[in-house]
């Protein structure tokens, strides 16, 4: 069995707490608030615009995460799985967490004003809602696609067994064919 040990992003090296809050908390939302009742990533965009430091960087990072979620089929992208850290300069996106590949064709959250379909073309169409121009959006998505296409090499370097890789292959290869290639 493999065990993943990760460094907590809500603690300093000395063990002191860095304030963390989920997007659900900061947006004043409740469990179950998602695409079905009109909520989505653009709610997070609004929070970033109004409350975050380094707005441009945070918006680009959010867009990158949406693209990644689409590319791996992570539909567990509800508001509790997005968070912010309070730094001396203000709120900033926390490191990404709880991202798991699936074959789902829809996101939990709207990726545009009116769609939660896991589709990069819909995300491209919404790039200005994320305050990005098309060129920047295309660059971000290209980087995400390159990373996802190279999942096998990373898996080998990380020591995943053939059995584990075979489990992920069905999901990731299907997503690559559906979203990236075709």
Question: Which stretches of residues belong to each language-model region?
Answer:
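Anionic ligand-binding catalytic core segments
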Residues: 1-182
């Amino acid at each position: 069995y493999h065990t993943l040990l990760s460094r907590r992003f809500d603690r300093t090296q000395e063990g002191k707490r860095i304030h963390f809050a989920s997007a659900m908390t900061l947006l004043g939302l409740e469990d179950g608030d998602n695409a079905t009742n009109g909520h989505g990533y653009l709610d997070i965009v609004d929070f970033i615009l109004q409350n975050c430091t380094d707005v441009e960087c945070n918006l680009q990072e959010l867009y990158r995460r949406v693209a990644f979620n689409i590319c791996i089929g992570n539909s567990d992208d509800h508001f509790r799985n997005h968070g912010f850290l309070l730094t001396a300069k203000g709120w900033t996106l926390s490191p990404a967490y709880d991202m798991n590949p699936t074959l789902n064709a829809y996101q939990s959250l709207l990726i545009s004003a009116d769609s939660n379909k896991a589709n990069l073309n819909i995300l491209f169409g919404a790039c200005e809602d994320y305050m990005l121009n098309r060129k920047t959006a295309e660059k971000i998505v290209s980087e995400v696609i390159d990373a996802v296409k190279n999942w096998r090499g990373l898996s080998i370097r990380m020591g995943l067994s053939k059995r584990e890789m075979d489990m992920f292959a069905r999901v990731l290869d299907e997503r690559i064919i559906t979203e990236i290639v075709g």
